[in-house]
Amino acid sequence: TTQATLTPEIIVKNHAGNPVEGVLSGKVGDITFEQPVKLAANEEKTVVFDATQFPQLKMKNPRLWWPNGYGTPHLYDANFTFRLNNEISDQKDFKVGIRQMDFDEKNHVLNLYINGRRFIGMGGNWGFSESNLNYRGREYETAVAYHAAMNFTMMRNWVGMIGDEELYDACDKYGIMVWQDFWLANPADGPDPYYPDMFIANAKDYVNRI
């Protein structure tokens, strides 16, 4: 791949009771970009950085993220910072991989493709990390490393039981795809959520995060 077009989308929220104006800046690898942002009192919005306005987002010769066994799961350092009056209001540092995922259902069979190559998901279900919910970064790091050492390429986050960032960070690092369930055991035959609003909020949070 000689070029990848990035389109960062960042959710920002003004927790103050008055409008604010600031600058949202981002960095992915060596690429930097920024734009002014206006927020009404208590407003939440999605700020989009589009390559038509920021041509530097057309990354040349990107190092791609590949699943375990298909190549190196390369990750870029990323940062997003929001400034008010030239002072940092909030910022987030994380790592991000560049990859393209596609699928089709030819002959009623689900086929997955990563960066144009056919991908075979091999792995198993993960429910709770363990019964006392004591897993943190070190434990997830070890468990997912074992997953990769067994030549697995995917795990299913069964019924969305795990929401820890450390799990997703470890999967990014070791090239493990995540089949993310929503918070339902059997959507076709129930039971339906007792609290639909909570369920929808949980689903939106997962979509925004991963």
Where are these regions (language model features)?
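A generic secondary-structure signal for well-formed alpha-helical elements
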Residues: 84, 175-178, 210
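Aromatic/hydrophobic pocket-lining residues that form the small-molecule binding cavity
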Residues: 140, 164, 199, 203
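Secreted/periplasmic carbohydrate-active enzymes, especially glycoside hydrolases
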Residues: 1-154, 158, 162, 173
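Aromatic-lined substrate-binding rim segments of carbohydrate-active enzymes
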Residues: 144-196
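An active-site-proximal structural segment forming one wall of the substrate-binding cleft
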Residues: 196-210
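Conserved helix-loop functional segments at active or binding sites
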Residues: 130-133, 184, 208
